[in-house]
Amino acid sequence: MEKGGEWPAVTQEAVQSDLQAMFRGAIRASLELFLEAELETLVGAGWYERVGGRRDRRNGAYPRRLLTSLGQIDVRVPRSRASGAVGGVVGRYRRRTAEVDALLTSAYVNGVSHRKAGELTEALLGERVSRSTVSRVAKALDAQVTALQQAPIAGAHPYLYLDATFVDARWARKVENVSALVAYAVGPDGHRHLLGVTLGAEESEASWSELLQQLLDRGLTGVQLVIADEHAGLAAAVRRWLPEVKRQRCTVHLQRNVLTKAPQRLRKRLAREVADLFRAKDLAAARSGLTHLQARWERQLPEAMACLTAGFAAATVFYGFPPAHWKKIRTTNGLERLHGEIKRRTKAVGAFPDRASALRLITAVALKVTAIWSDRRYVDVSLLEQQEVEQAA
């Protein structure tokens, strides 16, 4: 009783802590009973029992620490002279439960460094796991990588988005100039679907060709528009593998390129005027806007206007599709959050033991970020069919 005759306040946290301690004690007692029964069967006799059919003799015990969702449990594991330790119940190497493995996997994907993961398990469970343990548990993500790489692609996917983000990938004591190449598409249900993730050179035709070939081999069909930046290697790969498909240059990437050719003091105004071109009511209005923009800035910003003029046609292909889709198909901005998460997570890891481990993590991050796509429809694909009927009439 506290000073003043009052009982200390009972909090929910205190009650929960007491219950967890009670459950841990019950689990420990139960496990030790099972282990003793297992040893008795193995030896052929109980404690101090003298029988003629004895097969072995007891040889003490050793402590085994188990990590569970209720916390750390120290168990006394008996052993025999001939057979060693018993452990059919606990499992000789089963020192952490599926809950702990799930915790480590989630921490790994969500950007917790190996050191922080060790601190996390120590705080929650009373034992720090090693860097190698985190990496070993993370290999369970290999199934997700394989599933994404091999999953059949069913139905027509009219809009295919391709983009890449640079990854500071370090392994085998060297830094490789690689990027995470990502492909997603709008499917027949109008939802976005992550189709593929791989590592390669952003400007490499071979890297993009490999990814596109894999998508086609898995059943990708019905592509009407590819939305991507104007990297030479990417464009060449699309021309090779999807020669009949129209290509939309990402308007945001074009705007950024234009702004780099203008002085800082003019960029805010120029950015607003260039963006207005791609919000015009139709292609004719956009072309008229370009003419006015050229007349206004040609003398002061010749390089910026040359860049805009050169990329204008490729950036306005979206005007040939249903107006309700324009906002969704003129940029690859849908991948901006994914790129940010990939950069953040790979930076937290620092260095990967090999290329496969880097791909494993990046794929897991991509699946996590894009999981929300299944919650809502991105576009109404029936508008494409309506447009085709109207154009054919």
Model-derived features: positions:
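Short, flexible loop/hinge motifs at secondary-structure junctions
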Residues: 1-110, 114, 119-143, 147-159
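Acidic/histidine-rich catalytic cores and adjacent linkers
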Residues: 1-8, 12, 26, 37, ...
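Amphipathic alpha-helical transducer elements in NTP-driven molecular machines
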Residues: 16, 20, 24, 28, ...
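Mobile genetic element proteins and their domesticated derivatives, centered on retroelements
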Residues: 35, 39, 70, 82, ...
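Conserved, well-folded catalytic cores of nucleic-acid-processing
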Residues: 41-45, 107-110, 123, 127, ...
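RNase H-like nuclease fold core
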Residues: 76-81, 88-94, 99, 127-128, ...
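Metal-dependent DNA phosphodiester-chemistry modules and their immediately adjacent helices/loops
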Residues: 86, 258-288, 292
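Conserved beta-strand -> loop -> alpha-helix junction used to position metal-binding or nucleic-acid-contacting
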Residues: 225-232, 237-273
